[in-house]
């Protein structure tokens, strides 16, 4: 695997790009391990976790709980303030910016090699989104 030496200098969108892939892989593995194997079922369930709304809900709850370190908070702000010139048509800009923020932190943790903390983040997000899914 190629090492990204200057990951601390990457902009929020580049970090989010990496974080998106890391989180998508985590969720797919989680769903397969949970015994979900039908393609339609996999897609519908995965979307609840990897959607901008799901990620924004998770990050807001994590911030409210004081889960973020100072460094993670700084990276989250960098992701949230990143200027994206496209916003998906089914997502409002605020939600999209929070999800970019969430993904930026995951990307940063991954590139920094902080795998234990990355795992904590993804498990916490999973727990938060699952609770939201159960109550809806």
Curated annotation (Swiss-Prot):
User: Cross-referenced InterPro entries, in alphabetical order?
Assistant: Mini3_fam, RNase_III_dom, RNase_III_sf
Intracellular or extracellular location(s):
Cytoplasm
> Which top-level enzyme class is recorded in the Swiss-Prot or TrEMBL entry?
hydrolase
Active site location: 20
Q: Read off the Pfam families from this record.
A: Ribonuclease_3 (PF00636)
The cofactor required is: Mg(2+)
In its keyword annotation, does this UniProt entry include Electron transport? no
The protein's UniProt keywords, in alphabetical order, are: Cytoplasm, Endonuclease, Hydrolase, Magnesium, Nuclease, Ribosome biogenesis, RNA-binding, rRNA processing, rRNA-binding
Query: CDD domains, alphabetically?
Result: RIBOc (cd00593)
Provide GO CC annotations from the record: cytoplasm
Query: Which GO annotations describe the biological process of this protein?
Result: rRNA processing
- List the molecular function annotations (GO) for this entry: ribonuclease III activity; rRNA binding
The EC number(s) attached to this protein equal: 3.1.26.-
HAMAP family (alphabetical): RNase_Mini_III (MF_01468)
Q: What does this protein do?
A: Involved in correct processing of both the 5' and 3' ends of 23S rRNA precursor. Processes 30S rRNA precursor transcript even in absence of ribonuclease 3 (Rnc); Rnc processes 30S rRNA into smaller rRNA precursors.
The family annotation for this protein states: Belongs to the MrnC RNase family.
Describe its partners and assembly state: Homodimer.
Do you know which PANTHER family this protein is assigned to?
A: MINI-RIBONUCLEASE 3
**How is this protein named in the record?**
Mini-ribonuclease 3
Q: Which organism is it from?
A: Listeria monocytogenes serovar 1/2a (strain ATCC BAA-679 / EGD-e)
């Amino acid at each position: 695997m190629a090492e990204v030496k200057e990951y601390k200098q990457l902009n929020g969108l580049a970090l989010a790009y990496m974080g998106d892939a890391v989180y998508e892989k985590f969720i797919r593995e989680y769903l397969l391990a949970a015994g979900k194997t039908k393609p339609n079922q996999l897609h519908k369930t995965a979307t609840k976790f990897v959607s901008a709304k799901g990620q924004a809900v998770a990050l807001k709850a994590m911030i409210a709980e004081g889960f973020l370190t100072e460094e993670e908070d700084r990276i989250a702000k960098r992701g949230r303030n990143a200027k994206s010139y496209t916003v998906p048509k089914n997502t409002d800009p605020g939600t999209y910016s929070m999800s970019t923020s969430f993904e930026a932190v995951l990307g940063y943790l991954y590139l920094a090699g902080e795998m234990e903390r990355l795992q904590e983040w993804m498990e916490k997000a999973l727990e938060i989104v699952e609770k939201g899914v159960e109550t809806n």
